[in-house]
Structures are given as structure tokens and as C-alpha cells.
């Protein structure tokens, strides 16, 4: 699943540095070995303080305060490079202090993209004190009263019912079936193509339909 994720992320045209942030625990050693094998840059940090892990991973890329940071999660094998570029473009058109994200009212979970500045990430790292804010990287950012939240809403309302992230066994079954259906087109399949396939094959969409997403993301 991670290999599918990385391959699709690498299609993004506006990303010039991509680092995988994993934990320093024994259970994630296979991820480290995978990254070493694939020559994929990575950073190992705290298992519970994910905000710290993400912040130090960004530091490893020598990010400056004005640099744009994109947050993705590795449990999204069909993440869209098109949406990554679209979110970055939307962010560039506004204020760099804003929080830009793919709206899950118009897209399935599994296409999640969050965009913010390194300065905003540093502010969160230095000021977030609640356990939930340390566990969920961007929670502090988008819950601040002065946060400007800019959603990307170019999908369709009926797409949000689908679920493309892989947290449960049913999610893996759906992703496997969908990638099999996409065949050789899996690498460049657009969000529209993927969602249309799910609409055309409700038996696949139903595989994980009963799973309730844990919040916050």
C-alpha cells in the first residue's frame, strides 16, 4: 500500500521534496527498511507526539518559515497528485498563513491533503499542549480562532460517501479490489475516474461502507 501511495505522490508537479515521517519503534522498522531500499527520504520520531515527528521531519528538509508544507497520510494508497497540486495552487493564491485542505464534503477520505506554511507548523509545535494536538498534527492549526481555513471543493457532493483510506481490513479489501479494477491505469487514475468506478461498482463501494471514521483526522 505504501508503495502505491509513494508512486502516486511522485506524480505531483509542485512538490520538490518528499519525506516520510515514521516512528522510532520496533514495529515500524520494516517501513525504515522499505525507505532505505527505495531510497525514499525518511525521518524517525516519537510514536505518540506525531506533531513533533512531523515538525522535525520538515526541519530535516531544511524548510524555511515561508516554505509551503504539504501533509499527507501513508494510509491513502490512491492519493491524487492532481489534488496535491490543486491544493498547493489554491494555497499560493491566498495568504501563506492560511490552512488549505481538500474538502471531505466533496471528496472521499483517502484523498486527504493539507497545506500550510512552515511558520504555521512551527507555531503549532511550540504552542500545542493538549495530547490530541500533539497526536493529530494539524488539529492546533485549524482550531485557532484566527485561522483562515480554505477548502478545495472541486469534487462532487456524492463522492464524500466513499472511503479510500486503509485503516481496517475492509478498507484493504476495497483498495485491493479497486486497484485491480483500475489495472494498468492505477498510477495516473484521476479522482473523477476512481469515484466513477465506485459509482459503477457499488458492490466494491459497499465493502467498507459501515466503517465509521475516527476523528479528528
Spans of model-derived segments:
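Short phosphate-binding loop-to-helix
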Residues: 25-92
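N-terminal glycine-rich phosphate-binding loop and ensuing alpha1 helix
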Residues: 1-27
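Conserved acidic residues
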Residues: 16, 67, 97-98
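Conserved core of the sugar-phosphate nucleotidyltransferase
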Residues: 78-162, 170, 177, 193-217
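Conserved beta-strand termini and adjacent loop/short-helix elements that scaffold enzyme active sites
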Residues: 21-23, 45-47, 102, 152-154
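Short, structured coil segments at secondary-structure junctions
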Residues: 14, 38-39, 145
Amino acid at each position: 500500500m505504501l508503495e502505491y501511495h509513494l508512486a502516486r505522490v511522485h506524480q505531483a508537479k509542485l512538490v520538490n521534496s518528499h519525506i516520510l515521517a515514521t516512528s522510532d519503534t520496533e514495529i515500524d522498522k520494516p517501513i525504515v527498511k522499505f525507505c532505505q531500499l527505495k531510497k525514499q527520504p525518511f525521518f524517525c520520531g516519537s510514536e505518540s507526539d506525531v506533531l513533533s515527528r512531523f515538525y522535525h521531519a520538515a526541519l530535516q528538509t531544511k524548510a524555511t518559515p515561508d516554505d509551503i508544507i504539504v501533509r499527507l497520510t501513508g494510509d491513502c494508497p490512491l492519493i491524487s497528485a492532481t489534488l496535491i497540486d490543486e491544493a498547493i495552487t489554491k494555497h499560493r493564491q491566498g495568504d501563506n498563513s492560511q490552512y488549505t485542505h481538500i474538502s471531505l464534503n466533496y471528496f472521499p477520505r483517502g484523498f486527504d491533503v493539507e497545506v500550510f506554511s512552515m511558520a504555521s507548523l512551527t507555531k503549532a509545535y511550540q504552542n500545542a499542549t493538549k495530547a490530541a494536538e500533539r497526536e493529530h498534527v494539524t488539529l492546533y492549526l485549524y482550531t485557532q480562532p484566527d485561522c483562515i481555513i480554505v477548502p478545495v471543493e472541486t469534487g462532487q457532493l456524492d463522492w464524500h460517501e466513499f472511503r479510500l483510506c486503509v485503516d481496517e481490513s475492509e478498507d484493504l479489501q476495497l483498495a485491493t479490489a479497486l486497484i485491480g479494477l483500475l489495472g494498468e491505469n492505477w498510477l495516473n487514475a484521476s479522482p473523477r475516474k476512481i469515484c466513477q468506478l465506485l459509482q459503477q461498482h457499488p458492490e466494491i463501494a459497499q465493502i467498507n461502507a459501515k466503517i465509521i471514521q475516527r476523528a479528528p483526522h
